[in-house]
Amino acid sequence: MGSVSSRGHRAEAQVVMMGLDSAGKTTLLYRLKGYQLVETLPTVGFNVEPLEEPGHVSLTLWDVGGQSQLRASWKDHLEGTDILVYVLDSTDEARLPEAVAELREVLDDPSVASVPLLVLANKQEVPQALSLPEIRDRLGLQGFLGRSWDLRACSALTGAGLPEALESLRSLLKSCSLCMAR
């Protein structure tokens, strides 16, 4: 992978999306690309898609499989990451402790020590979905000192919250002084 760089007038950034299986990472990836709903299968390995953003930013989105047997390889995808996106299934309260533990393990990796984090609380269209304050409390996001982060509600199914998620992604990228200095 690479880092934020400027080739000509276009900045490039590597965005890695992680989260437990069935959180909706692949559906989010293709919705961000502008596709309507697509049928997805569990990701074995990863999916990679470019996303041209207004403002001369070219994003490469890496959607890394979240099945338990694939998580050991997550660290292989962290080197050169400019923004880490962690996708949560807001309706799966039973697996939230597992999701939190996996997120903390990723964030402990030295290669992403200063990398900004965007947490996407997916499946917010479901009435029983956890609220953002509930998710914030359970993740302990306030404890991420020294790291730029944001938490956004979204729905890969309806597309709700995705424009705001992209705006947050852009803001985090701009705030990343280490990224911009590369």
From Swiss-Prot:
- Which residues take part in binding GTP? 19-26, 63-67, 122-125
Q: Which Gene3D superfamilies does this chain map to?
A: P-loop containing nucleotide triphosphate hydrolases
Residues carrying the lipid (N-myristoyl glycine) are: 2
Q: Which GO terms describe its molecular function?
A: GTP binding; GTPase activity
Among its keywords, does the record have Metal-binding? no
Organism from which the protein derives: Bos taurus (Bovine)
Q: Name one Pfam family in it.
A: Arf
The record lists the membrane-crossing segments as none
| Official protein name in the record | ADP-ribosylation factor-like protein 11
Q: What does this protein do?
A: May play a role in apoptosis. May act as a tumor suppressor.
Gene of this entry: ARL11
Q: Which GO terms describe its biological process?
A: intracellular protein transport; vesicle-mediated transport
Keyword annotations from UniProtKB, A to Z: GTP-binding, Lipoprotein, Myristate, Nucleotide-binding
SUPFAM superfamilies, A to Z:
P-loop containing nucleoside triphosphate hydrolases
Tell me the lineage of the source organism. Eukaryota, Metazoa, Chordata, Craniata, Vertebrata
Concerning its family, UniProt says:
Belongs to the small GTPase superfamily. Arf family.
An annotated GO cellular component of this protein is: plasma membrane
Instruction: Indicate whether rRNA-binding appears among the record's keywords.
Output: no
